[in-house]
Swiss-Prot record:
<dbReference type="Pfam" id="PF00513">
    <property type="entry name" value="Late_protein_L2"/>
</dbReference>
<keyword id="KW-0167">Capsid protein</keyword>
<keyword id="KW-1163">Viral penetration into host nucleus</keyword>
<dbReference type="GO" id="GO:0003677">
    <property type="term" value="F:DNA binding"/>
</dbReference>
<feature type="disulfide bond">
    <location>
        <begin position="18"/>
        <end position="24"/>
    </location>
</feature>
<feature type="short sequence motif" description="Nuclear localization signal">
    <location>
        <begin position="1"/>
        <end position="9"/>
    </location>
</feature>
<comment type="similarity">
    <text>Belongs to the papillomaviridae L2 protein family.</text>
</comment>
<comment type="function">
    <text>Minor protein of the capsid that localizes along the inner surface of the virion, within the central cavities beneath the L1 pentamers. Plays a role in capsid stabilization through interaction with the major capsid protein L1. Once the virion enters the host cell, L2 escorts the genomic DNA into the nucleus by promoting escape from the endosomal compartments and traffic through the host Golgi network.</text>
</comment>
<keyword id="KW-1048">Host nucleus</keyword>
<dbReference type="GO" id="GO:0043657">
    <property type="term" value="C:host cell"/>
</dbReference>
<keyword id="KW-0945">Host-virus interaction</keyword>
<keyword id="KW-0238">DNA-binding</keyword>
<keyword id="KW-1160">Virus entry into host cell</keyword>
<dbReference type="GO" id="GO:0046718">
    <property type="term" value="P:symbiont entry into host cell"/>
</dbReference>
<keyword id="KW-0946">Virion</keyword>
<keyword id="KW-1176">Cytoplasmic inwards viral transport</keyword>
<dbReference type="GO" id="GO:0044177">
    <property type="term" value="C:host cell Golgi apparatus"/>
</dbReference>
Length: 504
């Protein structure tokens, strides 16, 4: 049988693993560590001769560091490598046209040769020297006189030019007035800054009207709060209802009215009653192949029922919630698929009760009114019934308890006609009495003969018992005595027709 030889891995892949275990094949170890026969010859021979840079060894020939150099060629070529492109030399001088083209257009009517004149170029240097004037002429202050006119003397010399700089800093507490007037005829410019604290400052910001915080008269009278929704009010805001159970996209909302949902929720899922704690979750392990109806149809296919959660309903009542998981579909792999249902039940509500009117005990006016209603539109009203007042203590006979004998009158009970004069009256909405007719049917005479029997008629009076002579024919005499008022009767069995019995 021929076997295909599997190719061994490369020596570079085998050597790192076998070196650790110290079980490398000799050929691989000598090749990697360069201890073959050829490597040893080169190592020993290099002691006497120089073979530097040739790359002679057990590896593949690469021509050394600089490659093989063919005879008669100065360039070195590496075997198996790419050719090195030759970079051209950079030109020293720029290559381009040296003739200058004319810019202006030529006149066709002019001569063919235009002689150009050389214009000498001259450079004019302009130097501006400023000589400041040390002595400033004094201008006398003019005086005014009513009889003489004002004369302004203007000097012939022009004033020297000066550079004036100004730095202004705004301060809202002061108002700064800066003025600089340079007019002709003045020897110098004046820059006057006036700072006056009497002038009003600049308004900065926005004018906001103030709010009047006067709340008016405060009442010191206390108010009685009667609209309490909880027995212990809290200042913190209470969450109305948990939002995680009321998402109709993920949970089915199922209201529950059975009281067992509070104390024994397991009885709604299965017919058994296992022992459990109220505050823990319930897990119902049942085979899905066995179709069993739950006591409550809302809890069918339930396999998990969480612990109770208390919250506040939107109408203010306390709500008990449980989260259930159904196992409606079961796959072959045992995975169950079902929806999640939110079962909730509103327990109670705390509202303000109306005041209860108390009745006075121990007093009776002798007049009683009884009211009731069979429907909202047909009330039943009872007329006033006058009850006789109770007899006074003087009407009773005082009997000594020490006496041994009592009369019969003391043992008789007194009959009090209480309620004998009551009248029941049914009236409609408008108050008109409604008369109800009770039909009374008289008794009809009974059908058929009454006291039917055998009568013996004798035309003559006879004394004693009559004599009856029996006949020879022995005929049974059947007497049917009818004494009923309904007219029904029963036949004697001898008068009924006999049935033929067929035996098979």
């Amino acid at each position: 049988m021929l076997r295909v030889r599997k190719r061994r891995a490369a020596p570079q892949d085998i050597y790192p693993a076998c070196k650790v275990a110290n079980n490398c094949p000799p050929d691989i170890q000598n090749k990697i560590e360069q201890t073959t026969v050829a490597d040893k010859i080169l190592q020993y021979g290099s002691l006497g001769i120089f073979l530097g840079g040739l790359g002679i060894g057990t590896g593949k020939g690469g021509g050394g560091r600089y490659g093989y150099t063919p005879l008669g060629d100065s360039g070195a070529v590496r075997v198996g490598g790419r050719s090195t492109p030759v970079r051209p030399t950079v030109p020293v001088e720029t290559v381009g046209p040296r003739d200058i083209l004319p810019i202006d257009s030529l006149d066709p009517l002019g001569p063919s040769v235009i002689e150009l004149e050389d214009i000498p170029a001259t450079t004019v240097e302009v130097v501006a020297e400023v000589h400041p004037i040390s002595d400033t002429p004094q201008i006398p202050a003019p005086t005014t006189d009513e009889s003489s006119s004002a004369v302004l003397h203007i000097p012939q010399e022009s004033p020297a030019a000066r550079t004036i700089t100004r730095s202004q800093y705004n301060n809202p507490l002061f108002r700064i007035t800066a003025s600089a007037d340079i007019a002709s005829g003045e020897a110098s410019a004046s820059d006057n800054i006036f700072i006056d604290v009497d002038t009003p400052g600049q308004i900065v910001g926005q004018e906001i009207p103030l709010v009047n915080f006067d709340m008016g008269p405060i009442s010191t009278e206390g108010e009685l709060e009667t609209e309490f929704t909880t027995s212990t009010p809290r200042t913190t805001q209470v969450q109305e209802r948990p939002t995680r159970f009321y998402n109709r996209r993920y949970y089915e909302q199922v209201p529950v009215t059975a009281p067992e949902f509070i104390t024994r929720p397991a009885s709604l899922v299965t017919f058994e009653n296992p022992a459990f704690e109220r505050s823990v979750s319930l897990i119902f392990e049942q085979d899905l192949e066995d179709i069993l109806n739950a006591p409550d149809q809302d809890f069918r296919d339930i396999v998990y029922l969480s612990r109770p959660t208390y919250s506040r309903a939107p109408d203010g009542r306390m709500r008990l919630s449980r989260l259930g998981r159904r196992a409606t579909i079961s796959t072959r792999s045992g995975v169950t698929i079902g929806a999640q249902s939110h079962f909730y039940m509103d327990i109670s509500s705390i509202s303000s009760n109306d005041g209860i009117e108390l009745q006075t005990l121990g007093e009776a006016s002798g007049e009683t009114v009884v009211q009731s209603s069979l429907a909202a539109s047909d009330p039943i009203e009872a007329e006033h019934s006058f009850i006789e007042p109770a007899p006074s203590i003087d009407s009773y006979d005082i009997v000594s308890l020490q006496s041994e004998t009592y009369s019969d009158e003391h043992l008789l009970d007194m009959y009090e006609p209480v309620g004998s004069s009551l009248q029941l009256q049914i009236s409609d909405v408008r108050g008109r009495p409604t008369v109800i007719d009770i039909p009374f049917r008289p008794r009809r005479p009974p059908l058929g003969p009454i006291n039917a029997g055998v009568d013996i008629y004798s035309p003559t009076a006879s004394v004693g018992s009559p004599t009856i002579n029996p006949t020879d024919l022995d005929i049974p005499l059947i007497i049917i005595h009818l004494d009923n008022s309904t007219g029904d009767y029963d036949l004697h069995p001898s008068l009924r027709k006999r049935r033929k019995l067929v035996h098979i």
